Swiss-Prot record:
Organism: Parabacteroides distasonis (strain ATCC 8503 / DSM 20701 / CIP 104284 / JCM 5825 / NCTC 11152)
Catalytic reaction annotation: D-glyceraldehyde 3-phosphate + pyruvate + H(+) = 1-deoxy-D-xylulose 5-phosphate + CO2
Function: Catalyzes the acyloin condensation reaction between C atoms 2 and 3 of pyruvate and glyceraldehyde 3-phosphate to yield 1-deoxy-D-xylulose-5-phosphate (DXP).
SUPFAM superfamilies linked: Thiamin diphosphate-binding fold (THDP-binding), TK C-terminal domain-like
Protein name, UniProt field: 1-deoxy-D-xylulose-5-phosphate synthase
GO-annotated molecular function: 1-deoxy-D-xylulose-5-phosphate synthase activity; magnesium ion binding; thiamine pyrophosphate binding
Cofactor: Mg(2+); thiamine diphosphate
Pathways involved: Metabolic intermediate biosynthesis; 1-deoxy-D-xylulose 5-phosphate biosynthesis; 1-deoxy-D-xylulose 5-phosphate from D-glyceraldehyde 3-phosphate and pyruvate: step 1/1
Family the entry assigns: Belongs to the transketolase family. DXPS subfamily.
A Pfam family: Transketolase_C
CDD domains: TPP_DXS, TPP_PYR_DXS_TK_like
Subunit structure: Homodimer.
Binding-site residues, thiamine diphosphate: H79, G120, H121, A122, G153, A154, N181, F293, E377
Annotated GO CC locations: cytosol
Length: 632
């Protein structure tokens, strides 16, 4: 009978309004039900498990207390929002999560009115929610609440602190919920903390606090200057009682907590107590990443996005073929260690992605020369610049889509000084199931105009090693290498590293009719496409250009003089990217071939598998083969 009760509660909730119709004593069962549903679905349909298991009680409490979607919930990053999706009309299609034409793995306003703001990159929630809260005040929507939910990891991002610093500058009733899951901030949850929350959230306390201030002002014992002194005294007293200085109240944000983020009934009480308080406020909750699934609780990093797993045994289902190609990420990690073994100046830097980019190899081999700086892409670049300025040779590894956040630092702090560092752009190109917020498709276009940069992309793992060596040994300025997520093409890649001449491409295949110019691993799709049309009466040349900047102008002159038809292929946006650079060269030098550019179109590409997205963009071997036939 207990199982039927669980199923009944789950089946009865389609939208938050259904949840709000339940009595509060049912909420614990709703949480257990929701947590199990997430585990059931993600065991077969991979996604971000740990973070969403940790926010089940918070999600239920938020939708129970607040009138969503009129009230706005802004999720930071969005990894923790799966429960939110299930409770807001997407339970029956949750199994399509991160699949092509299915629902997104992140909050997306185009998908649901309950998704108040786009999420994917960290640390934006406070600024976005503050803007929405101020807008509500300007529109006299005094009954609308705006809540930002941010994890302690995302709080390391500079944008979060910019939002905190500005939160009290304009009238707003913003509520910030800090989800502290022991990944960065560590405060204990005890009787004193809960007692302080009970006191500071009680209506009687806050009415007294307001009445005292109003009374002092009425009898002219308080003005704005004295008000600041009283606030400082209040904050100092609380700091004394808690034996800590409160950062948030230093920003004039009222602080409550920490509280147990897995006590749904207490969360409901606290949220009801503070939701109508005037001014910006922050509720600090303590949660456990992976809560309710023992393997995920015990290994938060491994179970952040574990892939398929056996929900009964807790074993991850990892299918690997014998002698399959290595991940580009592992090639980077092993190669960096090899280089570092021979030069003590080499250091590694990454903003919060040591496992994803395989900086962990460097951290294990040379812990004093490898740095995880947290979710702080701009800092990672400028920190690396400082290292380079003092004679170190940093390898700064940043995901391509996250490097967008450090653009000014690349220009101002690195390129202007022509500092010797290697910037490795991991996850370059289409990345698959994480979708539009994570596709690394803009880097070729946004880095190409910057003076002093060398920009390269390897065809395979062998050339990734060679380019890392080239950036280290053969160029004394900033050297950018972009490469994709996932497996490469080769089983035997541990070559003796060699310099790839800067600004020089390679002819992979000779031909007389059509010249195909590719850059990066997408060239392997070209190789397959040419094989598909080998029976056609067309002679196709294929060039692996390797370098976007500087271009191999000598080779391009030869191509411009010989071919009337050119196809460029890149795993990036075609506007402003590699194909555009080839077109500019041809126009500037008086060549007039017909140039067809293949790459990512002028659109934000959805989520799906790499083969599906390649086909969508016409970048897969079959689509390229069709274009070759069309050009014939």
């Amino acid at each position: 009978m207990a199982e039927s009760k669980v199923e009944h509660l789950l089946d009865s909730i389609h939208f938050p309004e259904d949840l709000r119709h339940l009595s509060q004593d049912k909420l614990e069962q709703v949480c257990a039900d929701l947590r199990q549903y997430i585990i059931d679905v993600l065991s077969e349909n991979p996604g971000h498990l740990g973070a969403s298991l940790g926010t089940v009680e918070l999600t239920v409490a938020l939708h129970y207390v607040f009138n969503t979607p009129y009230d706005r919930i802004v999720w930071d990053v969005g990894h923790q929002a799966y429960g939110h999706k299930i409770l807001t009309g997407r339970k029956d299609i949750f199994h399509t999560l991160r699949k092509f034409k299915g629902i997104s793995g992140f909050p997306n306003p185009a998908e649901s009115e309950y998704d108040a703001f786009i999420a994917g990159h960290a640390s934006n929630s406070i600024s976005a929610a503050m803007g929405m809260s101020v807008a509500s005040a300007l529109k006299k929507e005094l009954d609308r609440h705006v809540i930002a939910v941010i994890g302690d990891g995302a709080m390391t991002g500079g944008l979060a602190f910019e939002g905190l610093n500005n939160a009290s500058a304009n009238p707003n009733n913003l509520l910030i919920i800090l989800n502290d899951n022991d990944m960065a901030i560590d405060h204990s949850v005890g009787g004193l903390s809960q007692y302080l929350v009970d006191i500071t959230t009680s209506q009687a306390y806050n009415k007294m606090r307001y009445d005292v201030y109003r009374g002092l002002k009425k009898i002219k014992l308080i003005n704005n200057d004295r008000r600041e002194n009283i606030l400082r005294f209040n904050n100092s007293l609380k700091a004394l009682l808690t034996q800590q200085h409160n950062l948030f109240e230093g920003f004039s944000i009222r602080y409550f907590g920490p509280v147990d983020g897995h006590d749904v009934n207490y969360l409901v009480k606290v949220l009801n107590d503070i939701k109508d308080m005037q001014g910006p406020k922050l509720l600090h909750i303590k949660t456990k990443k992976g809560k309710g699934f023992k393997p995920a609780e015990e290994s938060a990093t491994e179970w952040h996005a574990p892939g398929k797993f056996n929900k009964e045994t807790g074993q991850r289902i990892i299918v690997r073929k014998l002698d399959e190609p290595q991940l580009y990420q592992d090639v980077f990690g092993h190669t960096l260690v090899e280089l570092a073994e021979n030069d003590e100046r080499i250091v590694g830097v990454t903003p919060a992605m040591p496992s994803g980019c395989s900086m962990t190899y460097m951290m294990k081999a040379f812990p004093d020369r490898a740095f995880d700086v947290g979710i702080a892409e701009g800092h990672s670049v400028t920190f690396s610049a400082g290292l380079a300025k003092e004679g170190m040779i940093p390898f700064c590894n940043v995901y391509s889509s996250f490097m967008q956040r450090a653009y000014d630092m690349v220009i101002h702090d690195v390129a202007l000084q022509k500092l010797h560092m290697v910037i490795c752009l991991d996850r370059a190109g289409l990345v698959g199931e994480d979708g539009a917020t994570h596709h690394g498709v803009f880097d070729l276009a946004y880095l190409r105009p910057i003076p002093n940069l060398v920009i390269a992309s390897p065809l395979n793992e062998l050339d990734l090693r060679n380019l890392m060596y080239t950036g280290y040994a053969a160029f004394d300025g900033p050297f950018v290498i972009r490469y994709p997520r996932g497996k490469g093409e080769m089983k035997d890649w541990r070559n003796e590293m060699q310099v790839l001449p800067i600004g020089k491409g390679k002819k992979l295949r000779d031909g007389d009719d059509i010249a195909v110019l590719s850059i990066g691993p997408i060239g392997n799709e070209v190789i397959k496409a040419i094989e598909m049309v080998k029976e056609e009466r067309v002679s196709i040349a294929h060039y692996d250009m390797i370098y976007l900047k500087p271009l191999d102008e000598e080779l391009l002159h030869e191509i411009g003089q010989k071919y009337n038809r050119i196809i460029t292929v890149e795993n990036g946006v075609i506007k402003g990217g590699f194909g555009s650079a080839v077109l500019e060269f041809m126009a500037d030098n008086g060549y007039t071939p017909h140039v067809k550019r293949i790459g990512v179109p002028d659109a934000f590409i959805e989520h799906g598998s790499i083969p599906e997205l390649y086909q969508l963009c016409g970048m897969d071997a079959e689509s390229i083969a069709k274009q070759l036939k069309k050009e014939n």
